[in-house]
Amino acid sequence: MQKSEGFRSKTRYKLSKHPRQKGLFPLTRALKCYTEGDTVHVVIDPSVQKGMPHPKFHGKTGTVVSQRGRAFLVRVKDGGKYKDIIARPQHLRESKL
């Protein structure tokens, strides 16, 4: 049987929530606005499928380049290259540094 190569493959633990965190996210997280140059962490919320970046970017840190509708364009370093990913604010956290 051939291996499945879907968007969420090999994410059994990465895209799962602990029992206390299950359920919907706070609405303020969806309404959060970032400005250009803000540093954000990509932390995927598995309860929201829309605007979810690829799971390989989970845990990465990048800078906000611009806004695209409800989502944000974030520039993340992947290996030696910079890649632009589109993610909604539910999947982003503001960096404290």
Swiss-Prot record:
A GO molecular-function annotation: structural constituent of ribosome
Cysteines joined through disulfide linkages: none
Pfam families per the UniProt record, alphabetical: Ribosomal_L21e
Assigned keywords, A-Z: Ribonucleoprotein, Ribosomal protein
GO biological process entries: translation
CC terms in the record's Gene Ontology section: ribonucleoprotein complex; ribosome
Family assignment from sequence similarity: Belongs to the eukaryotic ribosomal protein eL21 family.
Entries under NCBIfam families matching the protein: PRK04306.1
Protein's name in the database: Large ribosomal subunit protein eL21
Lineage: Archaea, Methanobacteriati, Methanobacteriota, Methanomada group, Methanococci
Gene name of the record: rpl21e
